[in-house]
Design a protein with these regions (language model features):
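Short glycine-rich, acidic/polar surface loops and turns
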Residues: 359-361, 369-372
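Beta-rich carbohydrate-recognition and catalytic domains
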Residues: 46-99, 103-163, 171-290, 299-364, ...
Length: 401
């Protein structure tokens, strides 16, 4: 019995030893599983932040398309307007609605969108007028049935008829004066022009922005697309002054600069050869290889002046093969707040590209997200853009996320 008991004790000792060894192995397995789960979670987390991680801290990268909202404005064949130039009723927004300006008026977001009638076929062949739409939430809009800005029998008719008034951008002063830049198109020459308003419906046209600069030297030069420098003051986006002057970036092929003391008469800055000073140009092999066209009003931030712009991609070897040839994508650049002509940094990749079907079909099927309107509303930034020269859509950036 004693010998037998000894044998049993030895077996128990061996069994205990095996149990301990098994326990250690199990713990190691559990630890390995835990490490793998942690690694997977980390990878997933990095994946979720990949979009913003590849952009510098000065950029506003995370603009999101609100689900089930876009496009927010589409053509309407049921609205008619008596055109003072044709002296006839026209379906003024029957063909295309696109390229919107945006601002805030009386607590509501107001979008001024370019609308084309059905008078002809082809880009730039119809007459453009500006429609008015307002929204409480920046997403759902109520439209007026007639345009608020159009070619008329006024001082600007020779410069605006028959092509119309195109591609507006609008910003507001602290005392509530709305300043709009738009393109006058008489189908001979495009000119950047200025208009002002207190209510966004009744406008005073001031004519070409550069009419008086350098004794009228540039009044007949091709010009368009202006981004006035703005800033946030007490939650309101207003036109800013730098060194006692107003500043704007402008230009289609290149980004140029101009200044003003009254917001109506603008003086373009010139280089050593007396030509328009180029502060940003297209880059070979990039999404903006063909042109760099100014977008919505620029924003003065704690990092500098943030300019959102439109880049067009060249076809072939000179373009960026990651994006469709001739497509328009949205880029961002940072300029020095003390010297607005000094480019500090620039994104190598677009922060917003054509994705939805209506952004890749219409007048411009190569794909277009053409940004022109930017407003701060309900603690968020709303970016309004044209889709393939045919629709209007919105994207939202929440700076608190």
């Amino acid at each position: 019995y004693e010998i037998g008991s000894g044998l049993v004790g030895s077996e128990m000792c061996i069994r205990d030893s095996l149990f301990i060894t098994s326990n250690v192995k199990m713990k190691r397995k559990l630890q390995n599983i835990a490490y793998l789960l942690m690694a997977a979670a980390l990878i997933t987390s990095c994946g979720e932040k990949k979009q913003t991680a590849e952009f510098p801290d000065w950029a506003w990268a995370d603009f999101q398309r609100p689900e089930g909202i876009n496009p927010i404005i589409s053509p309407d064949t049921t609205t008619f307007f008596y055109c003072p130039m044709r002296q006839d009723s026209v379906a003024w927004e029957a063909s295309d609605t696109f390229n919107p300006a945006a601002t805030v008026y009386d607590g509501k977001v107001v979008v001024l969108y370019r609308a084309e009638d059905n008078s002809a076929t082809g880009i730039g062949s119809r007459t453009s007028r500006l429609g008015y739409a307002s929204s409480d939430d920046g997403l759902h809009f109520k439209r007026m049935s007639v345009p608020v800005f159009y070619p008329a029998d006024d001082s600007q008719k020779e410069l605006e008829n028959p092509g119309g008034c195109e591609d507006p951008r609008v910003a507001v002063t602290e005392d509530g004066l709305y300043v709009m830049h738009y393109t006058q198109w008489n189908r001979k020459q495009a000119r950047l022009a200025v208009a002002t308003s207190r209510d966004l419906q009744t406008w005073e046209k001031h004519g070409p922005a550069f009419a008086k600069a350098y004794n009228g030297r540039f009044i007949d030069e091709f010009s368009k697309s202006a981004s006035i420098v703005t800033q946030l003051i007490d939650g309101k986006q207003v036109i800013a002054k730098i060194d006692g002057k107003y500043w704007m970036y402008w230009g289609e092929k290149f980004v140029n600069v101009a200044t003003s003391t009254d917001l109506v008469n603008w003086e373009p800055m010139l280089d050593e050869n007396g030509e328009f000073l180029k502060v940003m140009v297209p880059r070979a092999g990039k999404f903006d290889s063909d042109l760099t066209e100014c977008g919505p009003p620029a924003i003065l931030t704690d990092k500098g002046i943030l300019l959102l712009y439109n880049g067009k991609n060249k076809s072939g070897a000179e373009g960026d093969t990651l994006y469709t040839a001739n497509s328009y994508c949205a880029g961002q650049a940072l300029f020095d707040a003390k010297d607005p002509t000094k480019l500090i940094d620039r994104l190598d990749k677009p922060f917003y590209i054509p994705e939805s079907d209506f952004e890749k079909s219409g007048q411009y099927p190569a794909g277009t997200v053409f940004i022109e309107g930017l407003v701060f509303h309900n603690q968020k930034w709303f970016l309004y853009y044209g889709c393939a020269d045919s629709r209007v859509a919105v994207a939202v950036y929440d700076p608190l996320k």
